[in-house]
Amino acid sequence: MVGSRSASHQKTVKIVPMTNRADKLPKSWDPQAVEKDLYEGWVEKGYFTADPSSSKPAFSIVLPPPNVTGQLHMGHALDHTLMDGIARRKRMQGYEVLWLPGMDHAGIATQTKVEAMLKETEGKSRWDYSREEFIEHVWEWKRKFGGTIGTQMRAIGDSVDWSRERFTLDEGLSRAVQTIFKQMYDRGMIYQANRLVNWSPILETAVSDIEVVYKDVEGELVSIRYGSLNDDEPHVIVATTRVETMLGDVAVAVHPDDERYADLVGTTLPHPFLPDRQMIVVADDYVDPEFGTGAVKITPAHDPNDYALGLRHNLDMPNIMDATGHIAGTGTQFDGMDRFEARVKIREALAEQGRIVKEVRPYVHSVGHSERSGEPIEPRLSLQWWVKVEKLATMAGDAIREGDTVIHPKSSEPRYFDWVDDMHDWCISRQLWWGHRIPIWYGPEDAEGNRDIVCVGPDEQPPAGYEQDPDVLDTWFSSALWPFSTMGWPDKTPELDKFYPTSVLVTAYDILFFWVARMMMFGTLAGETTPEILGQGTDGRPQIPFNDLFLHGLVRDEQGRKMSKSLGNGIDPMDWVERFGADALRFTLARGANPGVDLPVGEDSAQSSRNFATKLFNATKFALMNGAEVGTLPERSELTDADRWILDRLEEVRVSVDDYFDRYQFAKGNEALYQFAWGEFCDWYLEIAKVQIPRDMEAASAQEQARGRNTQIVLGQVLDALLRMLHPAMPFVTEVLWKALTDGESLNVAEWPTAAMTNGGVATDEVAARRMADVEKLVTEIRRFRSDQGVKPSQKVPGAVDFAAADLAAQEDLVRSLARLDQPAEDFAASASIEVRLSQATIEISVDTSGTVDKEAERKRLDKDLAAATKELETTAKKLGNESFLAKAPEAVVAKIRERQQIAQEEVARISARLEELK
């Protein structure tokens, strides 16, 4: 018998009639039937509400604010799953957790959406309204439609503190924006200047780099001859994809070492359409002499590289377009034309002059487009407000270099330093109406046309008669204040005292520069200017906004491609919630989330996670039906090898999971839980429990009763700890199962597992571990052997095994039960045998299958299996032979296909051998 003890040590177990805890569970797991009510109950009980007066250690996260216009996409779902997992675990570990939610006003995105709505419903543009009227329309839209993301966050189980939800245009956050703007303006860190920006002619505003999407387009490459049309006289040939910009050309650049143009450097060439403009030939290392003709036209007001060269050579920078992308102010016949119409007309006019040397069509090249309005972006010289970033970037870089904030994974540090160490001044003004209006006021013009400029703080009033700057701030300006403005800065608040700096920021690596670096810049600045509010940093350095920075990868499709509308491969996370449940969505993402590594997902992944939730449900229900409960563990000496093994494995998993989660290795931690839950607890220990728990406790012997009762306690112990550890990733199914198992209040207020909750903190029983590893191998090999012999899984056959030789005498009944082997009779005659190498010996297993196998039926079955295995082998070989696929597919996908190929090869060999035996 398993774990048998001598009669002198047997105890009488009192059998107490128990209510069946499994009755507390529904018939089957249906996420849709329970998730919404569970979540609302958690919120009502205040489980997620943070208490700044608590004596518990603090842990805080701010939610990267999604756009008020948006809906949750897979990237959001990954973000939220990881943050929620962190927050839930920290609560269980005894921390006072603040997970602070909120939304971004999303200046351009929201304004364009409302403009489109007004155009459709009222046939009007924003210019048909006063600024105040239009803004009121936006607020009305926000009140009607801005709650979508909040509803979706509830659906996936976000344990945020809804009582502290913030919006970037809230009064308190607006006060923070004005405060830091004035601090920076007064320090000379904000200034106004004419510089090159990304300009959207449709939106009529500057846009940030992140709002520019690059697409390959079929255009034209036109070569233009500047200078004399006589080959014997000075001339150069330049090529451009934007012929219209030649109206802004002020120079031609060549490389200093290019002897072809050495005599031309410093001379001028007449502009074809502007007789008063002479274009100087300049020498600059920017030019590649090997590319094209080695000469480049220079349009400083409409190209970033030309702008930089223009600054170096002190060139004029004439702006040839107005805010709508029409040619303006050139004094030519092209004024008033749209830029694309002008492109054609100017090319035709140049051709008439004989200046078109060559035209290439189509010419495919990458062009930046406005993410919001879709048209090609126009680089344009524009008067804007700018942040002088030099000092801010230095502080943001030093915070990482000094270890005040730690980036996970460390491999992302070089990208961060590349950005902050080579950062250009930041354009913060936008020509919009929706957003934080720039707190700059202009006085009346004096006799010389000059105006007094005043920066007004949140508690100040502008002088009478002054007019406010019409522009608003870049959305990233206010979101850069998010970690501390949401807690009340610039006022001193209990929230800042308790929860700042925040513990960790969780976000995707693709906004490391656009958002994260700017939060570091503004966070360290606020730490430097208001240490009495935000606290002192380390070693005299400014306080930082977060201690850890966890950068996860991007969610991609199963082939590793970016999800996009054009590819039609996008996945709506809410569709998965409806079809598979929130836990399945969350576990799919959590199980694949490695720091800094992209995550390929597909429907198969979600179905697998849904199956896992069902497996947990069925396993718990089975355990409860068999009397599993949480209680005091018996003495180790009273447990079977299987009991000790599963408890020790539980402790090993707990230790590794804690280590993984502490290092933000969520994929490894959740994979460890999955493999333990399914591969060890469900597949093995539950099957063992069926053997160890008597079918009829009252009729069983005292020894069998004791063993069965111990098994019930071990079942409860393992399930209790396992459900607790899975709760951060799968909060709904674990809550239902844990409450049925323990009668506890909620996992939201339960303790995170410790060694005392697993194996009692004792050393691992290596002998029990060895024996159970041998049991698993032996049972697996016998099952495979039976299958190869054509024996049905449910059919018992007599078998002879030398258990004692393998030190498995105490496990004989267990192995025979799991492997469906009867004791051999006296007249036993083996029809087949195999050898299995175990840790202590190589033993022979002999079975008698005579009369149990229909050879003809077995041949047909094997032929069918062989055909399937051969097809799988051909399919995988074809994929692995496709060089294009191998170059594009993620390593994990290729590795999975190689594994499938290996399994198929083994199956073909095994089945072929068995067919040969049946001949």
Swiss-Prot record:
Q: Which cysteines are joined by disulfide bonds?
A: none
In short, the EC number is: 6.1.1.9
Entry's localization field: Cytoplasm
Q: Which domain of life is it from?
A: Bacteria
Q: What does this protein do?
A: Catalyzes the attachment of valine to tRNA(Val). As ValRS can inadvertently accommodate and process structurally similar amino acids such as threonine, to avoid such errors, it has a 'posttransfer' editing activity that hydrolyzes mischarged Thr-tRNA(Val) in a tRNA-dependent manner.
Give the family per the record. Answer: Belongs to the class-I aminoacyl-tRNA synthetase family. ValS type 1 subfamily.
Q: What is this protein called?
A: Valine--tRNA ligase
**Which lineage do the record's taxonomy fields give for this organism?**
Bacteria, Bacillati, Actinomycetota, Actinomycetes, Mycobacteriales
The UniProt gene name for this protein comes to valS
